[in-house]
Amino acid sequence: MSTPGIGGDFQLFSPLESTRRISQGNSLSVDQSSTDVASQDWTQWMRWDDEQAFPETANASPSSPFDLAFISPSASSGREASDAMHKDFSPDISLDFKSPSLGFFPGGDLNTNVSPQPDHVGAGSLSVHSNSPLSSIGASRKRKTGSDDDGSTMTSMFKAKQAPSKKRAHNVIEKRYRANLNEKIAELRDSVPSLRASYKQANGNSGDDDDDGVTSASKLNKASILSKATEYIRHLEIRNKRLEEENTALKIRLRQLDKAADQIVTSAASVSSPSDCTVSTESGASSSPSVFSHAEDVPSDHSPTSSHPPEGLIKVPDAWKRMRAAGSNESPYSQSYIQYKKTDSHSSQSGGGRMRSHLPNKYMLGALAGLMVLEGLGTEKKTESTAKGLLAVPLNLLNRVQLPSEVYSSAAFQYFWSSWHARAISHFLMLAILVVGSAFIVFVYLFNSDPRRQYSASKVAPDVTLSSCNFRRQAWLTSIQRVGVPRHRFFHEWYVVTSRCFEYVLRCLLGWKLYSLVTGVTEEDEKGRVKTWDIAIDAQLAGGDAEISKSRLVLTIFAAGTLPRSPMRMMLKALHCRILMWRVGEPGSWTFNVSNDVARSLARYQWDLARKMNAALPKDHPDSLPSHLATLLKIDCDDVMIDTIIQRAANLTWNRPTQEGTDDDEALLDVVEEDPAIQSSLDALAAWWSSHLLQGALLRYFEASSGGPDAKKSRNVFKSKIKLALDVAPQPSAAHTRALVMMAVFFERDRVANIGSVLAALPKEKGKNKQNQASNFLDSSLPISVREEISTAVRCAMIAAIFNARATGDTSLPATFTVEKAIHWFNRLPLDPVELTLLEFAAVYHLLHILASDIDYLASSDSSAPPSPMSKASDMLSSSSDDGEDGASQRNNNIIPHPMPNLGRVASELIYWARNAYNPAFYGFTSNLVKVIETECTSLCQTAGVHVADYSCVQEEKSKAKQAIDSKRRFAGGNEEASDNLLLSDES
């Protein structure tokens, strides 16, 4: 702020200039478009309380240049006098100027209102600062009335005492205040497009401005102007927000396009020559290749903004210009980077094209890298140059090395070659090359060997979502992430197998303590590694490895060698050896026999070692085996790992159906694969061997039932095998339940307890509560395929228990278990020739022996010999053709009207199954065994006074009637299809 005083900052006004200012002030007004003048006028109008040098009369014409500011900007002569005002109005008068001297006004009318000034503040010494803002005192002062408007504050500015001025009239103040508001509202009206358009239409001008979506105002009053201004502000806020969102989205998209362009530049560098991607530093218009580099240049808009960018900003790259120019034609922004699945043919072609394009790129990059290395290995240039190569090895120092003479070198070489050191080194190198080469050849065979190619009929087993195989695969995939098993790639697997082999050899030579000291493996790391490898090896042998190969089996068996020894790991390693060396070469060849012999020897060694370790461990030791595996370990390895079981174990490991490659004569072993109670590969081995032992025991029982000289010995062997099969089978698997139900059928001791255990393993009946049914079904570990046969066998055991309790006088059974009920169950046993299994056949066959041997019961009955069924044969045939299966039950009631066990029907059903059904071939039945069964059934019925031949005729007639019914049904179905075809042809 300028301070009063006499100096160079003050300017004096001549009377001529003052007269010219007064004469021009009557006809001038402030232009609306001049923002500077308007701001000055606004400042003067809002400071009317500080101006003391004006007359009180409001309507008087201005006599000084200070009255010019009170003219309304909307006056009619405002625009016409704007130029004159800008030319003649002196900008040297400060807005803070309040009290001019008396000599400043030529008229002298204001002498009574202004007190005389001192000499040093006269007309000759008065100065005004050009374009100075308001003083801090005047700007911060509030509006005052009455005696407060005495102008006493101006004394500090001019340092002179002024006389108090006369008060201004109130209407003048209000008029100027309203003029100020009207002017600002007029500016606000001109700032809103809709109001500006309405104003121009009212004045007769055409509205050329864009209203930006805002409707024009109907009446230009202050309220409408303010409301429209508020509406326009909200409209601008919404549009600004939308523009910000679009700007953000475009920035994100531009960033994505830059990333895509960088990726394409990186990928294109492998197929293009280095000169294509080289950017010249001399040309400023060149740019790096981008995703839009292939597009043609489209002429850009020749607007001033695009052709002449603002000065001082970073120049837009040409790649971005081409990208923006090509956007309207090729629409690159509309294409999504998310690639959806295409058709198989197109995807296969594109995949093959990508593979073909990658291989030359790799070769080209390798060749370029080789050239660069050779260029770096070149000799040093003779010319002096400041260029530096990429090779950091100081090869130029080799030129300074002085080589010995050729005579000395040849003599030293001959001396070294004749020494024993050279012979030892050469022998070691030859042996190493031989071993490594042999190992490499063996690994090539192991990597490419796949037993799936050896089988003619190969059907992939169906993948069940909730099967145990899926859980094993998840366990395998989880464990290999830590132990570092690579994918099925040649060099990766070769490296890992070789490293595991050296690790195994080094650990065997050094021992765990020295090995851990050398490698730095801690005890906690070793525990985690051991646990992970245990899970991985067991999951692989149980079929969890989907990419299994013999090289991976070698990898896991070497890893198993690095684990601490325990009985279970030794048993698993024995099975691992048999699976790894199973079927090496064609069956019957020398490689096949030698590999099996070597595998048996290794497995036998591991098995015996596990047996010794388990015998030395206490019962509560963490490494002690479960009861079923401990029982299995007591048996010889060659007796457990027979060819049939090893074939099924290999099929399980290689993800094949377990019955593939077998002789199809041991159907009891097929259920192990679908049994959810089998938790590991050793459990599967125990279940297979238990089922194999149970099947052999049942076949031995059929042979011993004929009553030969060795019958008693065979029965004892049979009972011991049944008990051993029960002890070996893992609980609660299907093999264990089968052995348990056979114990309940054949053994009188603890029969009721065994029946209760079998019933607990079976799901409840459908008539029970749904909640109990669902829980029992989920908790039951029995597969669905074995539930029917176990139910029939346990029913036979219950019938045998009832008859045994009647013979011995035992009253421990419930009162509802009567002999009549047992006979009713026996007569209604389901003996379907197609669905009957070996387990059901053995249970019914033994029950037939129990009932036929009860002579006292047959003698005490009303009729020991039932009537012949031949008299009812014709009625049965007629009823079978009409009523079907309902008539079959009626025929049985006609044959045996008395509550007697229908021994003839059961015996004839068993004989028919042994003769004609195809199921016995799956269980190892021979022709001699079939003859033994026929003879035994016939003799049992003859002892009871029943002729099996009559029932056999009925059985044959029944089978013929069933065949006739089936043929009639097929014929009726064919007629219906023919009639349907005729109807369709008629309609067409």
UniProtKB/Swiss-Prot annotation:
Described purpose of this protein according to its UniProt entry: Precursor of the transcription factor srbA, which is embedded in the endoplasmic reticulum membrane. Low oxygen or sterol conditions promote processing of this form, releasing the transcription factor form that translocates into the nucleus and activates transcription of genes required for adaptation to anaerobic growth.
Name of the protein in question: Transcription regulator srbA precursor
Gene3D superfamilies, per database record: Helix-loop-helix DNA-binding domain
UniProt source species: Aspergillus fumigatus (strain ATCC MYA-4609 / CBS 101355 / FGSC A1100 / Af293) (Neosartorya fumigata)
Annotated region (Helix-loop-helix motif), positions in chain: 179-236
Mod. after translation: In low oxygen or sterol conditions, undergoes proteolytic cleavage by rhomboid-type protease rbdB and is released as soluble transcription factor from the membrane.
Subcellular location field: Endoplasmic reticulum membrane
Name of a matching Pfam family: HLH
Induction: Expression is inducedd under iron starvation conditions and hypoxia.
Keyword Transmembrane helix: yes
Membrane topology: Single-pass membrane protein
Biased composition (Polar residues): 267-291
